[in-house]
């Protein structure tokens, strides 16, 4: 190896090395490197290129540089914007950096150039080395088809081992460390051996890469680039013995250990976790398996909350938060008493039936609070798909558990209070009958093994306290109705509405509208006037809206009053000020700074019976009597709807014809049959009321119920229609202040009806003084509060003779 010493400017390179014979350009932006380039251009255009050991070092010293670099000749230098120089260099020979002579204004090194010592090889030995290197290169080019063909031709054309080593050192991609090892090699043989090792390693890497790509191509379509990248990553992790879901699986196993469940359930979940582990990590099957495992782990299999068994506390909570609802409260307290005596018993399945706004949903929340149960509300209104209850089978895309299982997940315990809201509003379609799906849920004998289609493992619902709500039982299928304990939540009386408004609604709306009790006062008479003149409902929702409207208007009135007082205060302060040119804001600031004592206390607005119209306008309802005088053929009936009771005027006219019975007013089939019964019964009384047989052949009977756009049905108008028809035929008048309800038989017996409380309230609101009800409804009458019948005479009748006796003038 021939060596000689000299000094040259030094350029420190980052993350790159220049080999002898290499033509390359690079950018220089460090000041010392730019100075070195410019100094070299002034001398012989030669510079020593040395790689930095750490690329992050900004001002390298001798210890920060590799000991071996390359002497290069600068072919071209271009100045770029931003104080950057681009240089084109050619590597000439290797050199050893002995020391740095100076570091400012640029690095200058004392170096020793060295040329690789030529080997004393025979022609055959050199040919063997060339062929071996060429064979390795051919294998490399086979694996790497991106190599430039000109480079391949240059290497293959080389006949000397020295030339071939130089060409391969330049063109084969290798790490900075490998390039430094080649530069530091003591002779050509060492360079040759290192190059062979580098080529062999590159070939192995390329082969593994090709195998990975082939595995990926067998699984996915070639055009899905993003998907291919994910699969490549997955295959690499598989080759390394790693999987992407290891952490998730470990987490699932930890959750399984802590899960409170039976051994059978745990074993099933463990199998599902193992199945998830065996599924590929990025396909749809994996997502389904993951969702299923997470659902199973989140269910409260045997986790329960401790119920409060304090009867006094439960009673206090129920009485404090709700007025009335006596039957509901008694049933809850009965359940608590039984639970205390037996320690364990079936949870009740209750259905609260009543008009809207009567507190069915809110009482359920209070019951949960009284019993210390988790509260879950499931809205069933409009649900028509069976899968909403039982869940979807996991074979379907986007499958989910049903609402019952979802409710348990939300509660996180197996003994919550679950409110099934609007159970009478469920419907069915071609996908299944939701009411039938609810049969298993609400059957205390079966729901201990409820099977959701998604979960597929029996879930115990026997400890869930189900409370359903409905406006009517008529739309609930009989088998489902039979499984529930029906508790009627009847309409509120005016007195009950008053207490609810005074003790609950008023305080709630004052707080909701940002007011204070010291700012508003609504008298008792004003509340009663709102109830009687501005609402007509079974519940209290409309009443709450009216109270809210009053509070909103008072809030605005208070703010306007305060603003007006502030304006007067500022105006007064400005008049007292000597500076008449002060702006409005300056005066306001001065008033605030000096705390002028003209501030007024917020006034209290009182709402009374006299000024209630200021806030709510004219009354919307009046207690009017249906008929002001006794008339022929007009009778006041009583009806019961899903939103409460109402009066029903039935009008009958007799006119010449052919004996037809004309029915108008959108009557249902049951009501039409009641009309037929009534006319048949009246014909049986022909002799008693001196009606000729020819009358029914020569006259038509027309029965009409006003508000013809509203459908009407039910049997309880039987005695009303019969009385109206007899009045029209005989010309006898009916008492205007008498209302009646009851079903009639062909023999004239009066059968019982439902919704007695609602009907009596409707009669009272209309100003009726006497009400005729079936004798068999006497027990229902005795259960009613005295205030409902106060001011009315309620007469129980067993036959039509008694009805006619009290109704006809």
From Swiss-Prot:
Pfam families: AAA (PF00004), Lon_C (PF05362), Lon_lid (PF22667), LON_substr_bdg (PF02190). ATP binds at residues 354-361. This is Lon protease. InterPro entries: AAA+_ATPase (IPR003593), ATPase_AAA_core (IPR003959), Lon_bac (IPR027543), Lon_bac/euk-typ (IPR004815), Lon_lid (IPR054594), Lon_proteolytic (IPR008269), Lon_Prtase (IPR027065), Lon_prtase_N (IPR003111). The active site is at 716, 759. GO terms for biological process: cellular response to heat; protein quality control for misfolded or incompletely synthesized proteins. It comes from Lachnoclostridium phytofermentans (strain ATCC 700394 / DSM 18823 / ISDg). It is found in: Cytoplasm. Belongs to the peptidase S16 family.
């Amino acid at each position: 190896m021939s060596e000689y010493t000299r000094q040259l400017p030094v350029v420190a390179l980052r993350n790159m090395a220049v080999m002898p014979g290499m033509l390359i350009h690079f950018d220089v932006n460090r000041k010392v490197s730019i100075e070195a380039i410019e100094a070299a251009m002034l001398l012989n255009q030669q510079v020593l290129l040395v790689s930095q050991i750490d690329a992050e070092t900004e001002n390298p010293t001798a210890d920060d540089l590799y000991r071996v670099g390359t002497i290069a000749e600068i072919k071209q230098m271009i100045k770029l914007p931003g104080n950057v120089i681009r240089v084109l260099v050619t590597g000439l020979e290797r050199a050893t950096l002995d020391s740095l002579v100076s570091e400012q204004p640029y690095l200058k090194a004392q170096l020793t150039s060295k040329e690789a010592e030529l080997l004393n090889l025979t022609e055959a030995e050199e040919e063997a080395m060339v062929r071996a290197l060429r064979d390795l290169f051919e294998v490399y080019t086979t694996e790497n088809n991106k190599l430039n063909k000109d480079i391949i031709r240059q290497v293959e054309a080389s006949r000397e081992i020295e030339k071939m080593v130089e060409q391969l050192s330049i063109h084969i991609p290798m790490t900075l460390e490998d390039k430094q090892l080649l530069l530091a090699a003591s002779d050509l043989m060492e360079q040759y051996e290192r190059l062979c090792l580098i080529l062999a390693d590159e070939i192995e890497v390329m082969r593994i890469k090709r195998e990975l790509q082939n595995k990926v191509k067998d699984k996915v379509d070639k055009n899905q680039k993003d998907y291919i990248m994910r699969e490549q990553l997955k295959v690499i992790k598989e080759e390394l013995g790693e999987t992407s879901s290891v952490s998730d699986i470990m987490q699932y196993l930890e959750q399984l250990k802590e899960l409170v469940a039976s051994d059978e359930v745990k074993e099933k979940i463990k199998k599902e976790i193992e199945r998830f582990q065996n599924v590929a990590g990025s396909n749809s099957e994996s997502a389904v398996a993951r969702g299923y495992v997470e659902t199973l782990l989140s269910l409260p299999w045997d986790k329960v909350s401790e119920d409060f068994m304090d009867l006094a506390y439960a009673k206090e909570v129920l009485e404090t938060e709700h007025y009335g609802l006596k039957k509901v409260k008694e049933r809850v307290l009965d359940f608590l008493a039984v639970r205390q005596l037996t320690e364990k018993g079936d949870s009740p399945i209750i259905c609260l039936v009543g008009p809207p706004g009567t507190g069915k949903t809110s009482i359920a929340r209070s019951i949960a609070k009284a019993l210390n149960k988790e509260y879950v509300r499931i809205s069933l209104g409009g649900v028509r798909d069976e899968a909403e209850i039982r869940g979807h089978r996991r074979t379907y895309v986007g499958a989910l558990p049903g609402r019952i299982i979802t409710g348990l997940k939300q509660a996180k315990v197996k003994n919550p209070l679950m409110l099934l809201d609007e159970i009478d509003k469920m419907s069915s379609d071609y996908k299944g009958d939701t009411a039938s799906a609810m049969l298993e849920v609400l059957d205390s004998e079966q729901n201990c093994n409820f099977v959701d289609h998604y979960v597929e493992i029996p879930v115990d619902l026997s400890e869930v306290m189900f409370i359903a709500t409905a406006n009517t039982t008529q739309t609930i299928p009989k088998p489902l109705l039979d499984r529930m304990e029906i508790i009627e939540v009847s309409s509120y009386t005016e007195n009950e509405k008053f207490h609810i408004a005074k003790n609950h609604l008023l305080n709630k709306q004052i707080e909701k509208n940002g007011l204070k009790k010291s700012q508003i006062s609504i008298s008792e008479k004003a509340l009663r006037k709102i109830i009687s003149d501005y609402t007509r409902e079974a519940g209290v929702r409309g009443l709450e809206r009216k109270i809210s409207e009053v509070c909103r208007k008072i809030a605005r009135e208070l703010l306007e009053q305060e603003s007006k007082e502030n304006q007067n205060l500022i105006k007064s302060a400005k008049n007292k000020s000597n500076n008449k040119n002060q702006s409005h804001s300056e005066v306001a600031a001065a008033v605030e700074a000096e705390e002028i004592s003209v501030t007024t206390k917020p006034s209290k607005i009182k709402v009374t019976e006299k000024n209630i119209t200021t806030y709510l306008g004219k009354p919307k309802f009046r207690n009017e009597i249906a008929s002001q005088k006794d008339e022929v053929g007009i009778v006041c009936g009583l009806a019961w709807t899903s939103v409460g009771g109402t009066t029903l005027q039935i009008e009958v006219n007799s006119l010449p014809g052919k004996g037809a019975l004309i029915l108008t007013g959108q009557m249902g089939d049951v009501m039409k049959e009641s009309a037929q019964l009534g006319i048949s019964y009246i014909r049986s009384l022909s002799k008693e009321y001196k009606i000729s047989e020819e009358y029914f052949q020569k006259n038509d009977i027309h029965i009409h119920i006003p508000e013809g756009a509203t459908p009407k049905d039910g049997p309880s108008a039987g005695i009303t229609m019969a009385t109206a028809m007899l009045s029209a035929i005989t010309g006898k008048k009916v008492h205007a202040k008498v209302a009646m309800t009851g079903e009639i038989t062909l023999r004239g017996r009066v059968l019982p009806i439902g919704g007695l409380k609602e009907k009596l309230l409707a009669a009272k609101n209309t100003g009726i003084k006497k009400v005729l009800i079936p004798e068999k409804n006497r027990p229902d009458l005795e259960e009613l509060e005295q205030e409902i019948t106060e001011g009315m005479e309620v007469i129980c009748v067993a036959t039509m003779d008694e009805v006619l006796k009290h109704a006809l003038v």
